[in-house]
Protein backbone atom coordinates (compact mmCIF):
# COMPACT_ATOMS: atom_id res chain seq x y z
CA UNK A 1 0.00 0.00 0.00
CA UNK A 2 1.36 3.43 -0.93
CA UNK A 3 2.43 5.93 1.70
CA UNK A 4 0.43 9.00 0.59
CA UNK A 5 1.65 12.48 1.43
CA UNK A 6 -0.09 15.74 0.53
CA UNK A 7 1.70 18.99 1.33
CA UNK A 8 3.16 22.20 -0.04
CA UNK A 9 6.92 22.41 -0.47
CA UNK A 10 7.04 25.38 1.94
CA UNK A 11 5.19 23.32 4.57
CA UNK A 12 7.76 20.57 4.19
CA UNK A 13 10.66 22.97 4.76
CA UNK A 14 8.94 24.32 7.90
CA UNK A 15 8.45 20.78 9.18
CA UNK A 16 12.12 19.94 8.62
CA UNK A 17 13.30 23.15 10.27
CA UNK A 18 11.10 22.54 13.31
CA UNK A 19 12.34 18.96 13.62
CA UNK A 20 15.85 20.30 14.30
CA UNK A 21 14.55 22.05 17.41
CA UNK A 22 13.20 18.84 18.97
CA UNK A 23 15.97 16.19 18.65
CA UNK A 24 14.61 14.22 21.60
CA UNK A 25 11.50 13.35 19.60
CA UNK A 26 13.70 11.89 16.89
CA UNK A 27 15.57 9.81 19.49
CA UNK A 28 12.24 8.26 20.48
CA UNK A 29 11.51 7.42 16.84
CA UNK A 30 14.84 6.31 15.25
CA UNK A 31 13.11 5.21 12.04
CA UNK A 32 12.10 8.82 11.35
CA UNK A 33 14.84 11.44 11.45
CA UNK A 34 15.89 14.43 9.41
CA UNK A 35 18.60 17.01 8.83
CA UNK A 36 18.25 20.56 7.51
CA UNK A 37 20.83 23.17 6.50
CA UNK A 38 20.56 26.64 4.99
CA UNK A 39 23.82 28.27 3.94
CA UNK A 40 24.10 31.28 1.66
CA UNK A 41 22.15 30.61 -1.53
CA UNK A 42 21.74 26.88 -0.84
CA UNK A 43 19.18 24.95 1.22
CA UNK A 44 19.55 21.21 1.72
CA UNK A 45 17.67 18.65 3.76
CA UNK A 46 17.40 14.91 4.20
CA UNK A 47 14.48 12.94 5.62
CA UNK A 48 14.51 9.30 6.73
CA UNK A 49 11.11 7.66 7.10
CA UNK A 50 9.81 4.08 7.01
CA UNK A 51 9.03 4.66 3.30
CA UNK A 52 12.73 5.37 2.62
CA UNK A 53 15.15 8.28 2.24
CA UNK A 54 14.26 11.61 0.65
CA UNK A 55 16.82 14.38 0.14
CA UNK A 56 16.83 17.73 -1.61
CA UNK A 57 19.32 20.48 -2.47
CA UNK A 58 18.00 23.79 -3.79
CA UNK A 59 20.39 26.47 -5.01
CA UNK A 60 19.64 29.99 -6.25
CA UNK A 61 22.42 30.06 -8.83
CA UNK A 62 21.46 33.57 -9.92
CA UNK A 63 18.44 35.86 -9.69
CA UNK A 64 15.55 34.19 -11.50
CA UNK A 65 17.30 30.81 -11.84
CA UNK A 66 16.96 27.98 -9.33
CA UNK A 67 18.58 24.54 -9.41
CA UNK A 68 17.32 21.62 -7.33
CA UNK A 69 18.50 18.02 -6.97
CA UNK A 70 16.02 15.58 -5.42
CA UNK A 71 16.75 11.97 -4.48
CA UNK A 72 14.35 9.22 -3.38
CA UNK A 73 15.57 5.84 -2.15
CA UNK A 74 12.27 4.05 -1.58
CA UNK A 75 11.48 1.06 0.60
CA UNK A 76 7.71 1.27 -0.07
CA UNK A 77 5.42 2.34 -2.91
CA UNK A 78 5.25 6.11 -2.70
CA UNK A 79 2.77 8.78 -3.80
CA UNK A 80 3.46 12.48 -3.27
CA UNK A 81 0.99 15.26 -4.08
CA UNK A 82 2.34 18.81 -4.27
CA UNK A 83 -0.02 21.77 -4.59
CA UNK A 84 1.36 25.27 -5.15
CA UNK A 85 0.15 28.73 -6.15
CA UNK A 86 2.87 29.73 -8.60
CA UNK A 87 4.00 32.84 -10.37
CA UNK A 88 4.73 32.26 -14.09
CA UNK A 89 7.83 30.07 -14.43
CA UNK A 90 9.53 27.86 -16.99
CA UNK A 91 10.85 24.52 -15.78
CA UNK A 92 13.39 22.04 -17.15
CA UNK A 93 13.35 18.61 -15.53
CA UNK A 94 15.73 15.64 -15.92
CA UNK A 95 15.29 12.25 -14.25
CA UNK A 96 18.90 11.09 -14.11
CA UNK A 97 18.24 7.80 -12.32
CA UNK A 98 15.22 5.57 -11.64
CA UNK A 99 11.76 6.35 -12.96
CA UNK A 100 8.40 7.60 -11.68
CA UNK A 101 4.98 8.65 -12.95
CA UNK A 102 3.67 12.23 -12.78
CA UNK A 103 -0.04 13.00 -13.02
CA UNK A 104 -1.42 16.50 -13.60
CA UNK A 105 -4.49 17.44 -11.57
CA UNK A 106 -7.52 18.62 -13.51
CA UNK A 107 -6.62 16.69 -16.65
CA UNK A 108 -5.89 13.21 -17.95
CA UNK A 109 -2.31 14.24 -18.68
CA UNK A 110 0.50 12.16 -17.21
CA UNK A 111 4.05 11.28 -18.12
CA UNK A 112 6.69 8.80 -17.07
CA UNK A 113 10.01 10.33 -16.08
CA UNK A 114 13.14 8.31 -16.84
CA UNK A 115 16.74 9.02 -17.95
CA UNK A 116 15.92 8.87 -21.68
CA UNK A 117 13.79 12.03 -21.68
CA UNK A 118 13.78 15.47 -20.13
CA UNK A 119 10.73 17.70 -19.81
CA UNK A 120 10.22 21.39 -20.53
CA UNK A 121 7.28 22.96 -18.75
CA UNK A 122 5.45 26.20 -18.02
CA UNK A 123 3.74 26.79 -14.67
CA UNK A 124 1.42 29.49 -13.44
CA UNK A 125 -1.51 29.81 -11.04
CA UNK A 126 -2.78 26.73 -9.22
CA UNK A 127 -0.46 23.81 -9.94
CA UNK A 128 -1.11 20.37 -8.50
CA UNK A 129 0.86 17.27 -9.43
CA UNK A 130 1.09 13.74 -8.04
CA UNK A 131 4.31 11.75 -8.34
CA UNK A 132 4.20 7.97 -7.93
CA UNK A 133 7.19 5.64 -7.62
CA UNK A 134 7.48 1.95 -6.77
CA UNK A 135 9.31 0.38 -3.85
CA UNK A 136 12.95 -0.26 -4.70
CA UNK A 137 13.29 2.77 -6.99
CA UNK A 138 16.33 5.02 -6.53
CA UNK A 139 15.33 8.27 -8.20
CA UNK A 140 17.63 11.22 -8.90
CA UNK A 141 15.91 14.28 -10.33
CA UNK A 142 17.55 17.52 -11.52
CA UNK A 143 15.20 20.48 -11.99
CA UNK A 144 15.68 24.06 -13.16
CA UNK A 145 13.21 26.86 -12.46
CA UNK A 146 13.57 29.89 -14.75
CA UNK A 147 11.80 33.22 -14.42
CA UNK A 148 10.30 34.30 -17.80
CA UNK A 149 12.06 37.68 -17.48
CA UNK A 150 15.44 35.96 -17.22
CA UNK A 151 14.69 33.72 -20.19
CA UNK A 152 13.71 36.79 -22.19
CA UNK A 153 16.99 38.49 -21.22
CA UNK A 154 19.04 35.40 -22.11
CA UNK A 155 17.44 34.97 -25.52
CA UNK A 156 16.93 38.71 -26.16
CA UNK A 157 13.45 37.72 -27.33
CA UNK A 158 10.07 37.87 -25.52
CA UNK A 159 8.52 34.38 -25.04
CA UNK A 160 5.50 35.39 -27.16
CA UNK A 161 7.70 36.53 -30.07
CA UNK A 162 7.45 34.44 -33.25
CA UNK A 163 11.19 33.66 -33.17
CA UNK A 164 11.28 32.51 -29.54
CA UNK A 165 11.79 28.70 -29.32
CA UNK A 166 8.98 28.35 -26.75
CA UNK A 167 6.46 30.40 -28.70
CA UNK A 168 3.50 28.29 -29.79
CA UNK A 169 4.39 25.46 -27.38
CA UNK A 170 2.95 26.92 -24.18
CA UNK A 171 0.00 29.26 -23.63
CA UNK A 172 0.76 32.31 -21.47
CA UNK A 173 -2.92 32.55 -20.48
CA UNK A 174 -3.50 28.93 -19.44
CA UNK A 175 -3.21 28.18 -15.72
CA UNK A 176 -1.68 25.03 -14.30
CA UNK A 177 1.16 22.91 -15.68
CA UNK A 178 1.95 22.58 -19.39
CA UNK A 179 4.80 20.34 -20.50
CA UNK A 180 6.62 18.79 -23.42
CA UNK A 181 8.99 15.79 -23.50
CA UNK A 182 12.49 16.25 -24.94
CA UNK A 183 15.17 13.67 -25.72
CA UNK A 184 18.20 13.78 -23.42
CA UNK A 185 21.24 14.16 -25.69
CA UNK A 186 24.79 13.04 -24.81
CA UNK A 187 25.76 16.69 -24.26
CA UNK A 188 22.89 17.12 -21.77
CA UNK A 189 23.89 13.91 -19.97
CA UNK A 190 27.45 15.23 -19.55
CA UNK A 191 26.23 18.56 -18.14
CA UNK A 192 23.90 16.74 -15.73
CA UNK A 193 26.75 14.52 -14.53
CA UNK A 194 28.93 17.59 -13.97
CA UNK A 195 26.18 19.23 -11.90
CA UNK A 196 25.80 16.14 -9.71
CA UNK A 197 29.58 15.78 -9.30
CA UNK A 198 30.40 19.47 -8.80
CA UNK A 199 33.86 19.53 -7.12
CA UNK A 200 33.74 23.15 -5.90
CA UNK A 201 32.53 25.03 -2.83
CA UNK A 202 31.44 28.58 -2.04
CA UNK A 203 31.33 31.22 -4.77
CA UNK A 204 33.18 29.00 -7.26
CA UNK A 205 30.52 26.32 -6.79
CA UNK A 206 27.71 28.78 -7.50
CA UNK A 207 29.41 30.15 -10.64
CA UNK A 208 30.16 26.62 -11.89
CA UNK A 209 26.57 25.45 -11.34
CA UNK A 210 25.24 28.59 -13.03
CA UNK A 211 27.33 27.84 -16.12
CA UNK A 212 26.07 24.24 -16.26
CA UNK A 213 22.41 25.15 -15.78
CA UNK A 214 22.67 27.76 -18.53
CA UNK A 215 24.31 25.13 -20.75
CA UNK A 216 21.36 22.77 -20.15
CA UNK A 217 18.87 25.52 -20.99
CA UNK A 218 20.78 26.35 -24.19
CA UNK A 219 20.84 22.69 -25.23
CA UNK A 220 17.10 22.31 -24.61
CA UNK A 221 16.25 25.50 -26.52
CA UNK A 222 18.48 24.40 -29.39
CA UNK A 223 16.67 21.07 -29.56
CA UNK A 224 13.31 22.87 -29.62
CA UNK A 225 14.57 25.08 -32.46
CA UNK A 226 15.71 22.04 -34.42
CA UNK A 227 12.38 20.27 -33.87
CA UNK A 228 10.43 23.31 -35.05
CA UNK A 229 12.69 23.78 -38.08
CA UNK A 230 12.22 20.11 -38.97
CA UNK A 231 8.43 20.45 -38.77
CA UNK A 232 8.42 23.60 -40.88
CA UNK A 233 10.61 22.01 -43.57
CA UNK A 234 8.63 18.75 -43.70
CA UNK A 235 6.56 18.49 -46.90
CA UNK A 236 2.80 18.45 -46.44
CA UNK A 237 0.89 15.56 -47.98
Predicted regions and their residues:
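Alpha-helical bundle regulatory/interaction domains
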Residues: 4-10, 20, 100-237
Amino acid sequence: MANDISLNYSDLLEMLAESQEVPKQQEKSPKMRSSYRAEGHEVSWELYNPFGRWSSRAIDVREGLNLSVVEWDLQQDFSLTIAEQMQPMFGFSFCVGGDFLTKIAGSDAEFNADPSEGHVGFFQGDVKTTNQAAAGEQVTLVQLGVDPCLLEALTDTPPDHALHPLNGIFSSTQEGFQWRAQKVTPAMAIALHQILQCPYQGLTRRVYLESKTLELIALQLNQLNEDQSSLQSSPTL
